[in-house]
A protein has these predicted regions:
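Phosphodiester-processing cores and adjacent nucleic acid-binding clamps
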Residues: 1-195
Length: 195
């Protein structure tokens, strides 16, 4: 099995008693099938404003260069890179697109929370005393798309990424609404998928 292969697998799905009763597929037949090449034949091309690369933890699989090459091949005029809470894909995407007419829109899918008061400060002293694993304070968040409109927006986007990772990391980099509003200049905000 190699990356990019498409397989049709026939088998039985049943709980695996050796793996905490997780549902497991026991294959009875595996067949390699051809991967049809996808095309964008639309006369008017769309602009993807919410796109993940492999830099999105647990959500993106596509290498940055492949994503940019596909957008160019399909004749798209622009593409927004919006990984979850990070911006590491930007230089790779920029280098892949710099000899083309593709306009890259740099952004991020953030984890919006309504208030800083939702965040538990300090350490869980009971866990320290009893040597139990500390329980993470589950904070409800909503996803938000943040796009940089200009150079000021890029600086503010970088500030938001830094602040979310250094001050509000709670399993994922959280962004309080008031912090976003403090660094709002040059940014376009939009809704995203459900958290």
């Amino acid at each position: 099995i190699k990356p990019g292969m498409r397989l049709r697998i026939l088998g039985n799905v049943a709980p695996d008693r050796f793996n905490n009763d997780e549902m497991t597929l026991t294959p009875t037949g595996i067949m390699k099938i051809e991967v049809p090449e996808r095309k964008d034949n639309a006369e008017v091309k769309r602009v993807e404003l919410h796109c993940h690369t492999k830099m999105s933890k647990m959500d993106g699989l596509t290498p940055m260069e492949d994503l940019v090459k596909k957008a160019i091949k399909w004749g798209h005029k622009a593409l927004a890179i919006t990984d979850h809470g990070v911006v590491q894909a930007f230089p790779f995407c920029y280098n892949a697109a710099k000899k083309s007419d593709l306009k890259l829109i740099f952004g991020m899918e953030g984890y919006l929370i309504s208030d800083r008061e939702d965040i538990k400060e300090g350490i869980d002293q009971e866990s320290v005393d009893t040597k139990k694993k500390a329980t993470r304070n589950k904070i409800k968040s909503n996803h938000i798309i943040i796009l940089a409109q200009n150079e000021v927006g890029m600086r503010n986007l970088y500030k938001l990424v830094t602040i979310s990772h250094l001050r509000y990391l709670n399993g994922r980099p959280l962004l309080p609404r008031e912090v976003i509003m403090e660094h709002r200049d040059g940014l376009i905000l939009g809704s995203a998928c459900e958290a």
